[in-house]
Amino acid sequence: MSQPIPQPPGLPLLGNIKDVDPSNTWLSLKKLSEKYGEIFQIKVLGKTIVFVAGAALAEELCDEKRFRKFVGGPIVEIRYTVHDSLFTAFDDEASWGIHHRIIAPMLSTSMLADHFTEMRDITNELMEQWKGLGANNKIAPLGDLNRLNLEITTYTLEGKRLNNLTGPEHPVIKAMEDATSEAIKRPTRPGIFNWLFYGGKLKSATKTLRAFGAELVQYRKDNPTDRRDLLDALLTAKDPETGKSLTDAQVIDEIVTMPIGSSTAPCLLASAILFLTQNPDVVTKARAELDAVIGSGKFEYAHLTQLKYVEGIMREALRLSFPAPGFNIEPIPNAADKKPVLLGGGKYQIAHDQAVIIVLAGVNRDPEVFDEPLAFRPERMMGEAFEQLPAGVKKWFGNGKRECIGKHWAEQFNMVVLTQMIRDVDFEAVDPGYKLVQDGWFNVRPIDFHVKVKPREV
C-alpha cells in the first residue's frame, strides 16, 4: 500500500504559501529537499505540487516510456519571448521536431570541433585581460564569464563578434536576466498583478532580445559567407522530414533561446572557481595533468579528451552547483487510464496528470549515492567511478529527447574555459569564508563572490 508523500504543515486555505519564497524559489526547494528527502509535496491555494529530490525516483521519472517533459510555469511564461522554440515547445507541437532536425546536426560533436579554436582564442582574450589587472584587483568572475559566454555563443553559432569583453555590458545580458527572472516569478503572482504591475519588464526585455536576433539575421543577409554554422542552418536548411524551413521570426526565436540556454555555463564556471579556491589540492592535481598533456605548447582540440581530471572537475562542479536547478516531468497522458501513477515500486502514488519537479539540489547530493555528498571530489566523476554512478545523478542537462540540445557545446565551452583558467591564472577568494549564495534567478549562481586574479605562478 502506498504511503503519503511528505508535506510541510500549512496554513488554512492558503496551504504552504509561506514555505516557498517566490523571490528565491530554488533555495526554498533546496531547504525542503534537505528536510523531507527523496519526495515531498506542497499545496498552495488548493493546487498540489510534487517534488522529487532522490536519485532513484529521479531516474524512474526519466523513463520516457512513462513520463515526458512538462511545459508549464516559467517555461510557459518565457514563450512570450521565444514562442514555440526548442526549449519551450509543447510535446504535441510539430515545430519542436522541425526545429530539432534542423538544429541538432549543427551542435553535434563533429561540428563543434570546428569551433574549438574560436572558443580557445576568445577565452584567451579574457585570460590576458585578467592577467593585466595588476595588484590588489577584485573582480566578480560571474560578470566577466557572462560576457565571455555571450561573445562565444554569438561568434560560434552566428558568426559575429560583439567585442563585449570590455566596455559597457551588452544590453542582451540584462534583457536575458530580466526576461528569465520575470518568467520564474510570474507563476507565483495573481495574473492581474502581472498585467497591472509587471508586464512592462518582460515586454521591454523581449523587445531587446528579439531586436538582437533580428540584427544578427540582417547582418548575415548583408554579409553573405560560406561559413557553416547554426545561423546558416536556421536561415537555409529544410527539415528532412517535412521539407519545411524556418521563418525569420522562428529563426529569431532560436537565436534568442541559445544564450538563454547557455547561461548555465558562466554560472557553473563561477562556481567552479569558488570550489577551486576552497580546494587548492585540486588545482595542484589539475595543473600536473595540464602540464603533462599540454606542457608549454598550444592548447589544441586533441587535448580535450586527454584531460580526464579537468573533466572530473567540470562534472563535480555541475553536481554541486546545479546551475540548471531542475526540470519538470509529467506522466504521458492516456485517455483510457486515469488510475494513479505509482512511484518507487508502489511506495508512493501521484495523480495521472500530476506534474513533478525534479530538484537537482537533492538528487545531486543524495547520500544514498554519494559518500560525503557535500565534499568536492573530482575523482568520483572520472572513469569507472563515473560510469558506475546511477543515471539519475547525471541529469545536469535534462533528460531524453528534451535534453538540452546544446549539451555538447556547453561541455566543450566549459572544458575550454576551465582548462585555460586553471592553466593561466591564480585565483584568491576575497572572502575565504564565502558560501554559495543564490538570488532566485532562472539559474543557480554564486552571487557577490569576488576574487583576486593574477598570472599563474610557475
Predicted regions and their residues:
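Cytochrome P450 substrate-recognition site 1
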Residues: 2-20, 25-118, 122, 140-145, ...
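Cytochrome P450 I-helix active-site segment
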Residues: 3-13, 120, 171-178, 225-233, ...
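Conserved cytochrome P450 K-helix E-x-x-R motif and the immediately C-terminal K′/meander segment
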Residues: 16-37, 211, 215, 297-345, ...
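Conserved cytochrome P450 K-helix/beta-meander segment immediately N-terminal to the heme-binding cysteine loop
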Residues: 66, 358-385
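Cytochrome P450 heme-thiolate monooxygenase catalytic core
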Residues: 72-80, 114-269, 285
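Short, small-residue alpha-helix embedded
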Residues: 264-277, 417
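Cytochrome P450 heme-binding "Cys pocket" and the immediately downstream C-terminal segment
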Residues: 280-282, 389-390, 402, 407-446
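C-terminal helix/juxtamembrane-tail motif
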Residues: 444-458
